[in-house]
A protein has these predicted regions:
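Sec-dependent bacterial lipoprotein signal peptides
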Residues: 2-25
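Beta-strand acidic-aromatic groove motif in beta-rich domains, primarily in extracellular
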Residues: 64-73, 144-145, 225-226, 518-521
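Alpha-helical transmembrane segments of integral membrane proteins
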Residues: 12-13, 52, 125
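Membrane-proximal, proline-rich intrinsically disordered regions
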Residues: 27-74, 80-84, 91, 95, ...
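Structured, solvent-exposed acidic/aromatic patches
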Residues: 46, 77-448, 497-499
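Short, compositionally biased low-complexity segments
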Residues: 23-34, 76-84, 139-149, 467-482
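C-terminal functional modules
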Residues: 413, 421, 438-574
Length: 574
């Protein structure tokens, strides 16, 4: 797979594609009835390969625009809140909406007929995959949306909405057609940003998207889905992403220029020294470092601690340090920071993980050089070697050479585990839980090497983590963790819990770092886990079931009526 560094040389030869790159970081809202998006390619300005690259870049932009909301709602990252009804504005989905309707769907309509004339089956298959993914995710986040009448320009300036179920059916049809396109030898794209033109990998990604769609609506009882899912699983080696070599991910580079090729989260965490601009979730970090009797080495790759002891800081920097936990918080709920004792604060301990609680919207103190930052995986940041120094700027870690983890091999294993458990096969579910964990650990610990780094991780001067000991014990620690969670022994978590689905989903969340889409969907589909950290300032737990339509779309489309509230469920959530 090629990074955006490689892509840049080609893009600079086309002003049209350069405009698409700028749109990756755009938050502007363009209504469905705008006839020509300033970021969209036109037949006069681009060839088929440029259209394809534009769709791929907008696929990355679309995913980046929806992943954070899902992470915040599932406590993977911090939600400011303070309440669900006002946590997100009616413009929250404007960016993804624009990426889908003004860019992906429009480029699809322009590209596919031209590719069909040339018989470029691979191009068509990729386009159908990307369109299907966007369609599915729009339904997952928004419910019923315009589809059959959308992206038609002057033919329909006020497209009506289609039911989420019908859009899923249309997306499934595109997926099945894409599979057929990938089965035909054809012209390869000149610059495939995901798979380098590999039809085999695109076919596996398409099968995995089909599995995701059918599993997602399993509670809606489509009679054909069970047979299709079982067939996909039976031929998993050929049908699905089961190893990391076929991971569907968008790779970033290290170019700090215009256009910036680095992972967006790297820029927000490492652009300036000691200026991390977001908070980690206290409860999510605790799952890695405080809730089990085994070491989870992924913590060193996911999170970078700038400070070694939260208790050493004053009330201006950590104001909750002198507060009592809310009455609706159980004693087992993390509050303020990991190790905080709100009954006897002097007995508090800290290992430096500095985040916030779910829905904490307090003011922002001068703690940009103290907060825990995103680490090495998946944004290309700094591995946590225990040196406890503030972020030093743009040259740390992999310098932004990260990924958007859209459909990874570990996700496939967890989806199969869920399907097996939901159908009463606990032993198969356990086996796929174990293999999903193994895939996750392998991906995370091998990430630096995958992205082209000379070493597995970077240990710096002043590190308190012993490099030889850490790397030498990786395999033992990974095996111990998998055995502790999903082993066959009588004392494993799997064999001692009464809530196997809850355990499975919780472990899936820990593997999903960087992908809030699958976490948000899985939470609503399974109603697991049941012990997520409550909102800080209210016991009300009416979590967002779907997002509001973008305000400007409602204002400008007389066929679109805003939802009554955030509790409107999507069709498969029952």
């Amino acid at each position: 797979m090629k990074t955006l560094n490689t892509l840049k040389n080609n893009i600079l030869r086309s002003i049209a594609v350069l405009a698409v790159l700028f749109s990756l970081n755009s938050c502007e809202t363009l209504e469905l009835e705008i006839l020509e998006s300033p970021n969209a390619l036109t037949p006069a300005s681009s060839d088929i390969d440029f259209y394809l690259n534009a769709m791929q870049l907008n696929m990355a932009s679309f995913f980046n625009g929806v992943k954070d909301e899902g992470m915040q709602l599932t406590r993977m990252s911090h939600l400011y809140g303070p309440f669900y009804e006002n946590a997100f504005s009616t413009t929250q989905m404007s960016g993804p909406w624009n990426s889908a309707y003004s860019n992906i769907f429009t480029d699809y309509n322009n590209m596919v007929p031209r590719a069909a004339e040339k018989g470029w089956e691979t191009h068509i298959g990729i386009a159908k995959f990307i369109k299907a993914y966007a369609m599915i995710t729009l339904v997952d986040y928004l419910g019923d949306v315009p589809y059959s009448q959308a992206a038609l320009g002057v033919e329909n300036l006020n497209p009506g909405i289609d039911s989420g179920a019908s859009i899923y059916d249309a997306a499934l049809a595109l997926i099945l057609e894409a599979k057929q396109h990938f089965s035909v030898p054809a012209q390869s794209p000149s610059n495939d940003l995901f798979y380098g033109g590999s039809r085999a990998n695109w076919s596996k990604a398409t099968g995995t998207l089909e599995l995701k769609l059918r599993l997602q609506r399993r509670n809606a009882a489509d009679s054909n889905d069970a047979t299709a899912i079982n067939a996909l699983i039976a031929g998993a080696a050929d049908n699905l992403i089961t190893t990391s070599s076929s991971d569907f991910q968008f790779k970033y580079g290290t170019l700090n220029a215009s256009p910036d090729s680095r992972h967006p989260a790297f820029v927000s965490n490492y652009e300036l020294a000691a200026d991390v601009n977001s908070y980690m979730s206290n409860s999510y970090m605790a799952e890695f470092v405080a809730q089990k009797d085994v070491v989870d080495v992924r913590a060193n790759y996911y999170f970078y601690r700038q400070d070694d002891d939260v208790t050493d800081n004053d009330d201006n920097e950590i104001p909750c340090g002198n507060e009592r936990r809310p009455s609706h918080y159980a004693l087992s709920d993390i509050f303020c920071y990991i190790g905080f004792n709100d009954v006897t604060p002097s007995e508090s301990t800290s290992n430096g993980y500095w985040g916030r609680d779910h829905g904490d919207n307090d003011g922002i103190p001068p703690d940009g050089g103290l907060r825990t930052a995103w680490g090495l995986y998946p944004i290309g940041g700094q591995f946590d070697d225990g040196s406890f120094t503030s972020t030093e700027g743009q040259d740390m870690g992999l310098k932004g050479a990260g990924i958007q983890p859209i459909l990874l091999s570990s996700y496939t294993h967890f989806m199969i585990a869920e399907w097996s458990l939901a159908n009463g096969d606990a032993e198969t579910a356990r086996q796929f839980l174990a293999s999903g964990l193994a895939e996750s650990f392998s991906k995370v610990t091998g990430f630096a090497a995958e992205m082209g780094a000379a070493g597995a991780v970077e240990f710096r001067s002043g590190a308190s983590v012993d490099e030889t000991a850490f790397l030498g014990s990786l395999t033992d620690n990974i095996n111990a963790y998998i055995d502790y969670v999903a082993g066959t022994g009588a004392t494993s978590l799997w064999n001692t819990t009464d809530d196997k689905m809850g355990l499975l989903v919780q472990e899936y969340f820990l593997a999903l770092w960087g992908n809030g889409v699958e976490a948000y969907n899985t939470f609503r589909r399974t109603d697991k886990p049941t012990d997520l950290q409550p909102l800080l300032k209210t016991a009300n737990n009416d979590m967002i079931q779907s997002f509001f339509y973008p305000r400007t779309e409602v204002d400008n489309n007389n066929q679109l009526t805003q939802k009554a509230d955030h509790l409107v469920k999507v069709f498969w959530d029952n």
